[in-house]
């Protein structure tokens, strides 16, 4: 019981420091590494390449554009049991919000292992892990603040003060 509570405490601690915002795709199943890192290497074939492009509201000039590309493949096929699978993959995502006001880029690597539960490998249990290096950039020259709007119109000057740390953020997730 003590081990259970220790494991639960570790999981809660990890979840509390995690930061994630996944891009939204209408055909999310076509971007397996974006959807779930446990899907890495889970396919029939030698390798898999996936690419997605999403342009939300294309008639509006301040649209949201999201692009992804991923490559994954199975590894150690001759060293694992025939019913087991292991895969590695890489993923790249770029997301432009509001005509480039907020740009998010990240690249990641993923690893997954699938253990066969029966003699044919029809039933498997798998786990996947993914780590990403994320970069967010805010272009404050394109942002409009409340103090820039006066009864006489748009002044173009703001009293907001930004540091480079607020404009460019890099982190590992």
Pin down the residues of each PLM region:
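Bacterial Sec-dependent N-terminal signal peptides
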Residues: 1-24
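Subset of outer-membrane beta-barrel
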Residues: 21-173
């Amino acid at each position: 019981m003590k081990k259970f509570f220790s494991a639960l405490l570790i999981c809660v601690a990890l979840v509390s420091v995690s930061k994630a915002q996944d891009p939204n795709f209408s055909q999310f199943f076509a971007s397996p590494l974006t959807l779930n890192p446990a899907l890495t290497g889970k396919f029939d074939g030698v390798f898999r390449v996936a690419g997605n492009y999403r342009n939300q509201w294309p008639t509006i000039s301040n649209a949201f554009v999201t692009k992804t590309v991923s490559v994954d493949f199975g590894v150690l096929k001759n060293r694992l049991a025939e019913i087991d699978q292991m895969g590695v993959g890489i993923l790249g995502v770029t997301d432009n919000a509001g005509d480039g006001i907020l740009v998010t880029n990240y690249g990641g690597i993923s690893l997954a292992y699938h253990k066969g539960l029966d003699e044919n490998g029809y039933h498997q249990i798998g786990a996947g892990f993914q780590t990403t290096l994320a970069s967010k950039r805010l272009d404050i020259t394109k942002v409009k603040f409340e103090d820039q709007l006066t009864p006489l119109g748009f002044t173009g000057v703001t009293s907001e003060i930004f540091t480079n740390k607020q404009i460019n953020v890099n982190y590992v997730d």
